[in-house]
Swiss-Prot record:
Protein name: Protein FAM114A2
InterPro entries documented for this protein: DUF719 (IPR007998)
Top-rank taxon: Eukaryota
Phosphoprotein listed as a keyword: yes
Residue spans of biased composition, Basic and acidic residues class: 51-63
Higher taxonomy: Eukaryota, Metazoa, Chordata, Craniata, Vertebrata
A Gene Ontology molecular function term of the record: purine nucleotide binding
Native species: Homo sapiens
Keyword annotations from UniProtKB, A to Z: Coiled coil, Phosphoprotein
Coiled coil start-end: 268-295
Length: 505
C-alpha cells in the first residue's frame, strides 16, 4: 500500500496542470480540484480490497500504472460535477414543487368557486362515488411522497371532477331535451283539436254511416252548449239528415251489403272449374254497369217540371219490378221547387211597393231574414232529398234479396239503378243552382262577405249529397251479385226438372 500511495501522489499533482491547460480555466479551479481530491485520497482504503496484481513485464507494468491513475482522475471529475448538478437539481425540484403547490391551490379555489356557482358536488362527494379509484390513488400517494406525486394527485382529482361533472351535465342536458320534446308534443296535441282524432281515424276504416253519425253527435254536443240551438239545427246538414231517417236507412243498407258480400265469397270458394270461370265472367259484367259514366250538367239546359221528374223516377222504378214507389222522394222535390218560386216572387213585390226611405229600411230587414231563411231551407231540402233517395235504395235492396220471383235479370236492374242515380245527382245539382239564384236575387244589397259563404255552403252540401247517393248505389253491388247467383241456380234447377220427363219417356 505504501508503494501505491507513492506512485499516485506525484501523478495527481501532474493531473492538475493538465486540466488547467486543457480546460483553459484559472488556477482556482485547479485548487478546487486538489481540494476535492484530498478527500478522495482518504477514502482509498476501499481500493485496497482489490486483488493483488500479478507480476508482469516492464512494459505491462508501465501501462498498468498509467491506467489506475486515469481511472482515479475520471472518478474524481464526475463526482465533483455530480455534486454541482445534484444541488442544482434539488433546487429545481424544490422550486417546481412550490410552483405546483401554488398552481394546485389556485385550481382548487377556481373549482370550489365553480362548484358553488353551478351547484356541482364537491371533490369529497365525488371521491365517495368513485371510492375504489380514489383508494388506489391514495395508496400510490403514500408510497411516493414527492412533490411531483402530489401534483399528479391534484391533477387526477381534477380530472375525476371534470369527468363526473361532464357526465352530470350531459345526463341533465338529455333529460332537459326529453322533457322539452314531451312538452312540445303535448302543446301540439292541445293546440290541434283534430290531432288525436286524426291518429284514431288512420288506425281504423270507418264506413259512411259511422262518419255521418259521429259528425251528428259532435254537432249535438257543440250545439247543446249554445243558446241558438234551433238556429244551428236548421242549417246543419248532419242533424237534418238524421232527422229524416237517412242515417238509419244507410246503416241498414250497409248491413245488407256486408251480408251479401260474405255470401258471394263463400259461394265462389265452393265452386271450381268451368262453373267458377263462367260465374266470374257474369259478375264482371255486372260490375261494369256500376261504373257511373261522367255526365255533363250542361247537356240538359231546359229545366224539367215537377211532372217530368216524377214521371221519370216512376218509370225507372217500374223497370226494377219492386213494390216500392218513389212518392216520398217526388213530394220532397216538388216542395222544394214550390218554395223557391214563392221566395223569388216575394222580393220583387216588395221592391215595387217600397218607395219611401222607411219602407226601404223595412225591405232591407226583410231581405236579410229571407237570405237566412233561404239558406236554411236549402240545406233542409238537400238533406231531405238525399235521405229519401237512400231510403229507396234500402227498400230496393231488401225487396231484391227477399223477393221470390225475378222477372228481370240483375244486370238489367243494375242499369236501371245507375240511370236513377244519375237523375238524382242532376236533380241535386239543379236544385242547388236554383237556391243560389234565389240567394243572389234576395241579397242584392248585401255585402259579398255575407252572401258568398251562404252560396258556398249550399254548393258544398249539394256535392256531399251527390256523393252519399253514389256511395249508397255502390252498396247495392253485392246485393245484385247474390241476385244473379240465385237466378242462375234457379234456372239450372228448371233445366234439370225439364230434363227429368224426357228421361222417363
Amino acid at each position: 500500500m505504501s508503494d501505491k500511495d507513492d506512485i499516485e501522489t506525484p501523478l495527481l499533482t501532474e493531473a492538475a496542470p493538465i486540466l488547467e491547460d486543457g480546460n483553459c480555466e484559472p488556477a482556482k479551479n485547479s485548487e478546487s480540484v486538489d481540494q476535492g481530491a484530498k478527500p478522495e485520497s482518504k477514502s482509498e482504503p476501499v481500493v485496497s480490497t482489490r486483488k493483488r496484481p500479478e507480476t508482469k513485464p516492464s512494459s505491462d507494468l508501465e501501462t498498468s500504472k498509467v491506467l489506475p491513475i486515469q481511472d482515479n482522475v475520471s472518478k474524481d471529475v464526475p463526482q465533483t460535477r455530480w455534486g454541482y448538478w445534484g444541488s442544482w437539481g434539488k433546487s429545481i425540484l424544490s422550486s417546481a414543487s412550490a410552483t405546483v403547490a401554488t398552481v394546485g391551490q389556485g385550481i382548487s379555489n377556481v373549482i370550489e368557486k365553480a362548484e358553488t356557482s353551478l351547484g356541482i358536488p364537491g371533490p369529497s362527494e365525488i371521491s365517495t362515488e368513485v371510492k375504489y379509484v380514489a383508494g388506489e390513488t391514495n395508496a400510490k400517494e403514500n408510497e411516493n411522497s414527492s412533490p411531483v406525486a402530489g401534483a399528479f394527485g391534484v391533477f387526477s382529482t381534477i380530472s375525476t371532477a371534470v369527468q363526473s361533472t361532464g357526465k352530470s351535465v350531459i345526463s341533465g342536458g338529455l333529460d332537459a331535451l326529453e322533457f322539452i320534446g314531451k312538452k312540445t308534443m303535448d302543446v301540439i296535441a292541445e293546440g290541434d283539436p283534430g290531432f288525436k282524432r286524426t291518429k284514431g281515424l288512420m288506425n281504423r276504416n270507418a264506413t259512411l254511416s259511422q262518419v255521418l253519425r259521429e259528425a251528428k253527435e259532435k254537432e249535438e254536443i257543440r250545439t247543446s252548449n249554445e243558446v241558438t240551438v234551433e238556429t244551428d239545427k236548421k242549417t246543419h246538414y248532419g242533424l237534418l239528415f238524421d232527422e229524416f231517417q237517412g242515417l238509419s236507412h244507410l246503416e241498414a243498407l250497409e248491413m245488407l251489403s256486408q251480408e251479401s258480400e260474405i255470401k258471394v265469397k263463400s259461394i265462389l270458394n265452393s265452386l271450381s272449374g268451368e262453373e267458377l270461370e263462367t260465374l266470374k265472367v257474369e259478375l264482371e259484367q255486372l260490375k261494369e254497369t256500376f261504373s257511373l259514366a261522367e255526365f255533363c250538367e250542361e247537356e240538359e239546359e231546359e229545366k224539367k217540371g215537377d211532372e217530368d221528374f216524377t214521371k221519370d223516377i216512376t218509370e225507372l222504378f217500374s223497370q226494377l219490378h219492386v213494390s216500392s214507389k218513389p212518392e216520398k222522394l217526388a213530394r220532397a222535390r216538388n216542395t222544394a221547387h214550390e218554395w223557391i218560386r214563392k221566395s223569388l216572387t216575394k222580393p220583387l213585390a216588395e221592391n215595387e211597393e217600397g218607395e219611401k226611405q222607411s219602407e226601404a229600411e223595412n225591405t232591407e230587414q226583410v231581405n236579410k231574414n229571407s237570405i237566412e231563411d233561404i239558406h236554411a231551407f236549402a240545406i233542409r231540402s238537400l238533406a231531405e232529398l238525399t235521405a229519401c233517395s237512400i231510403e229507396l235504395f234500402h227498400k230496393t235492396a231488401a225487396l231484391v234479396l227477399h223477393g221470390r220471383k225475378q222477372e228481370v235479370t240483375a244486370i238489367e236492374r243494375s242499369q236501371t239503378l245507375s240511370q236513377m242515380t244519375i237523375v238524382l245527382c242532376k236533380e241535386l245539382s239543379s236544385l242547388s243552382k236554383e237556391f243560389t239564384t234565389c240567394l243572389t236575387t234576395a241579397g242584392v244589397k248585401e255585402m259579398a262577405d255575407v252572401l258568398n259563404p251562404l252560396i258556398t255552403a249550399v254548393f258544398l252540401e249539394a256535392s256531399n249529397s251527390a256523393s252519399y247517393i253514389q256511395d249508397a248505389f255502390q252498396l247495392l253491388l253485392p246485393v245484385l251479385e247474390i241476385s244473379l247467383i240465385e237466378n242462375k241456380i234457379e234456372s239450372h234447377r228448371h233445366e234439370l226438372q225439364g230434363q227429368k220427363p224426357l228421361l222417363e219417356h
